[in-house]
């Protein structure tokens, strides 16, 4: 797929990795629909993006775990841009909680929330977006769509307090190949990015000393990843037609003990 011909949906696109990805696509000529929950920054984000990329962007209030919410938003995208041929799933939550602690056992509802948003929400977006992609006329290479999910190095090297998060991201990574096989008959590719330590809003709030300590754990380059690097890999995955069913670690070779 050529980026300038893409109508992409980016979940979690109002901040962090998702926002960087949305901007990367917009700057390269794509039409982008950002699906995210409304927050205090949404109004200013909409104004800024419309100022920079008038007519090329939609920002929709969407809960990825709610099928009705997703279906309604997909209809808006189709009416505005006429097609959906790329989905990048960045929506997610990261909640750290040990299995047992001074307060007792890990709350089950908290575990279920992480699984619901990160894993079930990802699959919900995939299944409903794929139905729309199947309606597309194949391009010259026969392709109808491209889906990129977001896992994490925690899928492979989970740390203390990450039982729920690692399970959710491990599920995303494990589903990559079967999803690619399921959708191959529809000429839709599926890949996953597993980012390491990235300078997202979650880490930006840490003291500089803490960020430096985290960066030292990276093999090379010894720094936190930039969201633009995630965005560029997503862009590459869209254009690389032979890349399918793969989970790519984007982590500076970090392997956490």
Predicted segments, located by residue:
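C-terminal substrate-recognition "lid" of short-chain dehydrogenase/reductases
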Residues: 226-250, 255
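Conserved mid-core segment of classical short-chain dehydrogenase/reductases
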Residues: 71, 94-112, 131, 135-141, ...
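Alpha-helical segment proximal to the catalytic Tyr-Lys
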Residues: 131, 180-182
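Catalytic Tyr-x(3-8)-Lys segment
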Residues: 116, 209-229
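Catalytic Tyr-X3-Lys loop
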Residues: 93, 104-124, 147-148, 165, ...
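Canonical Rossmann dinucleotide-binding motif of NAD(H)/NADP(H)-dependent dehydrogenases/reductases
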Residues: 2-33
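Short, small/polar-rich loop/turn modules that mediate ligand/substrate recognition or access, typified
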Residues: 184, 189, 243-246
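Residue(s) in the substrate-gating loop at a strand-loop-helix junction
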Residues: 152
């Amino acid at each position: 797929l050529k980026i300038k011909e893409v109508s992409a949906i980016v979940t979690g696109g109002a901040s962090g990795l998702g926002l960087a990805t949305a901007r990367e696509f917009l700057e390269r000529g794509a039409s982008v629909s950002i699906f995210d929950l409304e927050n205090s920054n949404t109004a200013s984000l909409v104004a800024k993006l419309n100022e920079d990329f008038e007519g090329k962007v939609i920002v929709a209030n969407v809960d990825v775990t709610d099928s009705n919410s997703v279906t309604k938003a997909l209809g808006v995208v189709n009416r505005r841009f006429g097609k959906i041929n790329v989905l990048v799933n960045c929506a997610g939550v990261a909640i750290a909680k040990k299995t047992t602690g001074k307060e007792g056992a890990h709350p089950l509802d908290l575990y279920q929330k992480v699984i619901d948003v990160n894993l079930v929400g990802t699959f919900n977006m995939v299944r409903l977006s794929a139905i729309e992609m199947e309606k597309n006329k194949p391009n010259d290479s026969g392709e109808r769509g491209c889906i990129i999910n977001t896992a994490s190095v925690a899928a492979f090297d989970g740390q203390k307090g990450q039982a729920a998060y690692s399970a959710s991201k491990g599920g995303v990574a494990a589903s990559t190949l079967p999803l690619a096989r399921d959708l191959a008959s529809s000429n839709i590719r599926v890949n996953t990015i597993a980012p390491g330590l990235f300078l997202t809003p979650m880490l930006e709030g840490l003291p500089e000393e803490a960020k430096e300590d985290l960066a030292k754990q990276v093999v090379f380059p010894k720094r936190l990843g930039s969201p633009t690097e995630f965005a560029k890999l997503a862009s590459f995955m869209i254009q690389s037609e032979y890349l399918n069913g793969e989970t790519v670690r984007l982590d500076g070779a970090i392997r956490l003990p």
